[in-house]
């Protein structure tokens, strides 16, 4: 509703002001997403780094080359040089060296400690902020000083786009076009190209914000395209499907195949687009 939209914008503005205050008060910032980093986790991390950069606060994004989805890795190598990667990112192995008594750790697109790229970092950190769009689980980061969880949002990149918009003062906040493209790809991913129920007015406004910063929607779309091997794997899984009940489809992957969780999710999304299918279970 219109009233709800107004409420969300007021909340986003308040959250942006609070987060900016915490970043300014910190000695440095470490930004961390979840294991098997996807485009939304990394995109929202880059957006948060841009906020820190505009506030002249040293910030690093935790990145593990061994725990990243193939599409995310492809986007990183396409948009950034090796020097850029070394400047922006830090490995889970080296991140503890950057943790000081006044460091702010911002966790994005996840709120379960066990699912983060470096759970040890959360055990040692004294100041932790959480930005997430998933419904709160029983397992939660202990005593964060800032929590922005909005299940009505389509993605973490949508939330961070709003934070960038409302954190902007004169002069306008800078967001590199590569970061904006990454964030747009994250929104595409989590909304399944705006088909998800969580895609609303705020989602399209977030995309508009990112386009203003030079996001390349063609390139963002390319990042989500399947390699031939993945396409063949999806087709193979779908061919091994059964319908135990009316409107329910169960698809089984070959135990010999090594399959990313994102691929299983895509098979489920694709199956749910078939008329008459109300529920789908993909096991692999």
Q: Which role fits each region the language model picked out?
A:
Residues 1-11:
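Helix-enriched interaction subdomains in cytosolic or periplasmic regions
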Residues 11-37, 41-88, 92-104, 189-284:
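Hydrophobic helix-and-loop "lid/oligomerization" segment in the mid-to-C-terminal part
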Residues 34-35, 65, 108-111, 131-134, ...:
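Fold-independent oxyanion-binding glycine-rich loops
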Residues 77-82, 124, 147-149:
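Short, hinge-like loop/turn segments at secondary-structure boundaries
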Residues 88-143:
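Active-site cofactor/cluster-binding pocket
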Residues 106, 129-131, 146-149, 249, ...:
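Hydrophobic/aromatic beta-strand patches that form the interior of the parallel beta-sheet core
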Residues 133-206:
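Short alpha-helices
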């Amino acid at each position: 509703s219109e009233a709800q939209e107004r409420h969300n914008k007021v909340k986003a503005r308040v959250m942006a002001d609070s987060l900016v205050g915490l970043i300014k008060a910190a000695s440095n910032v470490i930004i961390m997403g979840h294991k098997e980093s996807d485009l939304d986790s990394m995109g929202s991390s880059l957006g948060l780094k841009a906020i820190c950069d505009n506030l002249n606060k040293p910030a690093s994004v935790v990145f593990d080359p061994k725990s990243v989805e193939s599409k995310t890795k492809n986007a990183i190598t396409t948009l950034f040089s090796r020097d850029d990667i070394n400047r922006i990112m830090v490995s889970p192995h080296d991140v503890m060296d950057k943790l000081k008594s006044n460091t702010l750790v911002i966790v994005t697109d996840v709120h379960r400690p066990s699912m983060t790229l470096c759970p040890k970092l959360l055990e040692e950190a004294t100041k932790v902020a959480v930005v997430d769009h998933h419904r709160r689980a029983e397992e939660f980061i202990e005593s964060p000083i800032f929590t922005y969880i909005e299940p009505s949002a389509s993605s973490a990149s949508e939330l961070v786009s709003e934070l960038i918009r409302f954190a902007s003062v004169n002069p306008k906040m800078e967001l590199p076009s590569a970061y904006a493209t990454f964030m747009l790809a994250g929104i595409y991913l989590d909304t399944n190209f705006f088909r998800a129920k969580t895609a609303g007015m705020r989602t399209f406004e977030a995309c508009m914000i990112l386009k203003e910063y030079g996001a390349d929607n063609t390139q963002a779309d390319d990042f989500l395209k399947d390699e031939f091997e993945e396409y063949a794997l999806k087709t193979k899984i779908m061919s091994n499907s059964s319908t135990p009940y009316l409107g329910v489809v169960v698809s089984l992957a070959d135990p010999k195949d090594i399959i990313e969780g994102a691929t299983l999710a895509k098979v489920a999304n694709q199956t749910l687009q078939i008329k008459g299918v109300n529920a789908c279970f993909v096991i692999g």
